[in-house]
Amino acid sequence: VFTTMMVLLLGEIDISIASIMCLSGCCTGVAFEAGLPIVPAMMVGLLVGAACGFFNGILLVAFPDLNSTIVTLGNQILFRGIAYMILEDKPITSISSKMSFLAWSKVAGIPLILIVFFVETLIFAFVIHRTKFGRSLYAIGSNAKASRFSGIKTNQIKVLVFTLSGLCAGFAGLFLISKLGSARASIAKGYEMEVIAMAILGGVSTAGGKGKVLGAVLGVFSIGFLRYGLGIVNVSSQ
């Protein structure tokens, strides 16, 4: 959700993150089945995610008149299509025993995924609120043209943010296939709207230049509690 927040701060949007999660997970599974140890296979998934995000960013910089909604929507279909071409919706289950530690491990009784989320929160809070790079995000989102004239490298920052978005989506994809116990081309459908909703619910403006990490965290927990509550009363959250 934090890289989605960064994209929104720029006044852009990334609808392809769920498909990147899926493609990264599928590539991790394929790499593992091809004989790579689990850690290098996971690195393949992360690299695929970063490459997808980089592709989004490069397209938006190369064709500035294109809307990020249209670009990432098109790439959402493209990335999902590549995943189907690779797996044909045949699940890879051989990774379940090797990757289960991501979703189910605990450190001192605390789930690993919660620890990772806490560490990510601290890192992104520092980067967004305490660094020159973070201040540049707010400036670009508020007025991209003025930011460019003031010396901010808007194009480079845009490509970097979308690359980070893809990388983190790939990272989330690893946790997802770890939880599911398999990689398949149909996973993570609809997740992009949920993640964007978390950020917006936390007060991040879709117009750019406004939002806090704390708000995004509250958005995550709000959606999480909503899903949990629906589960208790046996109502699908999909």
PLM region spans:
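Alpha-helical transmembrane segments within multi-pass membrane transporters and channels
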Residues: L36-Q76, L218-G219
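Hydrophobic core segments of alpha-helical transmembrane domains in multi-pass membrane transport
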Residues: T3-T4, Q76-A83, V116-V127, F162-G173, ...
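Membrane-interface helix caps of multi-pass small-molecule transporters
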Residues: M6, V30, A34, A51-F63, ...
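Single transmembrane alpha-helix segments in multi-pass membrane proteins
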Residues: V1-A34, I58-D65, A199, G203-V213
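Transmembrane helix-bundle core of multi-pass membrane transporters
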Residues: L66-F133, I157-L160, K179-A188, V235-S237
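Helix-loop-helix "hairpin" substructures at the membrane interface of multi-pass membrane proteins
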Residues: P37-G45, A51-N56, A108-A183
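Transmembrane alpha-helical segments in multi-pass inner-membrane proteins
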Residues: A169, A183-Q238
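Hydrophobic alpha-helical transmembrane segments
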Residues: S19-L23, V39-L47, T69-I70, L114-V119, ...
